[in-house]
Amino acid sequence: MKKKICRKILFFLIVVAISFYFLVVRRDTNMVLSNVQANFQNLEIWLTTVDQKNLLKKQNTSDFVKKNVNKSKYIIKIDPKKKYQTMEGFGASLTDASAYLIAKVLPENEREKVLKKLFDYKEGIGISFLRQPMGASDYATKIYSYDDMPKDKSDFELKHFSINHDKEYIIPLLKKAMQINKQLKIMATPWSPPGWMKATDNMIGGSLWPDCYEVYANYFVKFINEYKKEGIEIYAITPQNEPLYVPPHYPGMSMSAEEQAEFIKNYLGPAFKKNNIKTKILCYDHNWDVPEYVMTVYKDKEAYKYISGSAWHCYAGSHETMTKIHNLFPDKEIWFTEASGGEWIPAFEKAFLDQMMHVIRAPRNWAETVVWWNIALDENNGPTVLPHSTCRGLVKIEQKTKKVIYNVDYYTLGHISKFVKPGAVRIDSNTYQNDLENVAFLNPDKSVVLIISNRTSESKIATVQYLNKNFNIYIPPKAAMTLCWK
């Protein structure tokens, strides 16, 4: 009798347990899955793969979000409450060469299409930042400044200053770009002052004469004001492109850290203040391998007060240098202002992985911008004043055929520029460096952007955790993925 009662009690308890499981546990599990689906029903996934079958292509979410898999060993935890830097923008340089190709080589209908593909968020990649050479760089149709003079002549009053060269095709394109993307910011950087200001009496080589510091500061003021008359605000400048390198074949100039500090504190900063110019001044604008340059400039307290931050290039050193400088000078901005694609890292696979590394690691090391180099070059990697060019633009415009080809650089930049808006804040996420790297942002409209790069030859499944929600995402080998949701 007792055994029968015990069996009945045991059976009853089993029935209760099973009922509890189906009614409560399974119900809660289904509710969680339903909530995840509801919370991420506006999830967008954009993919690029090295086989080029997907080039910044929007995907069906259901093909990549995996619901019935075990928790991945790759757990990407995103914390929107832990915030870092505010982003300024993403883009490249509309060099003289690039502007010439777009304005002079392409027919009007193709030109409009290319501009939309570059600057429009919906039809293109939404470039929101341009770094413009002040005068000729290595990628120009000729060597020129805004105040060229005959040999042994000077113009200390800048009576011959003119931006007419830029008015022909650079400024009209800048205006069109600004119409397409209202958030576009423009910074400017000289490769060289006019030759008469230098010891070489030439835009190639040399350094700035000490008695030309004042007129060179006024040259910046004149440039900013003349562009303003054209309806173009110059958001920021640097005093010199790559001041530690003096190129033998194109405009350039040596400027030591001590010289730059002297120029900023006694000439450029006061000239901006006197003329009520709000344009930001950033120092350096060269590679990560010499952080001492920035430290030396910043040690000058008078120069320091005029400087908004430092600008960095990718050709030597490591991204972590920017974090080092941020930690030493947390009140100063960090900008990543030049990374060119080229034959030294061939497309597609090697260049793709290299550039996605910059897209992710630069912001993770406090950079507020990600900026490639030439927007457009031709089939010979020009126009250029160089005897030989190995650089690659975002776009190739063939002068003979008028054909337009979008290079790997276009798609890598697009993974961030199309989705992360100016004013977005980088938010915390853990990364798996050299494996499954990522960076996360919170846009001004409260949408979240997660950029993932799978640097390995194997597909991965990662668990993305955001607040109290999570989902599993499949990432193909050697691929980049941008995810967006609200």
Residue ranges, per PLM feature:
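Loop/turn elements at helix/coil->beta-strand transitions in domains of secreted/extracellular proteins
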Residues: 88, 123-130, 181-185, 230-236, ...
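N-terminal Sec-pathway targeting helices
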Residues: 1-13
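Carbohydrate-binding surface patches
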Residues: 418, 429-467, 478
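Active-site neighborhood of glycoside hydrolase catalytic domains
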Residues: 215-236, 243-343
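Conserved, mostly hydrophobic/aromatic
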Residues: 92, 126, 186, 237, ...
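N-terminal catalytic cores of secreted or lumenal carbohydrate-active enzymes
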Residues: 56-234, 266
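C-terminal beta-strand-rich structural cap/linker in extracellular carbohydrate-active enzymes
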Residues: 475-486
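Aromatic/acidic polysaccharide-binding cleft in carbohydrate-active enzymes
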Residues: 333-412, 428-431
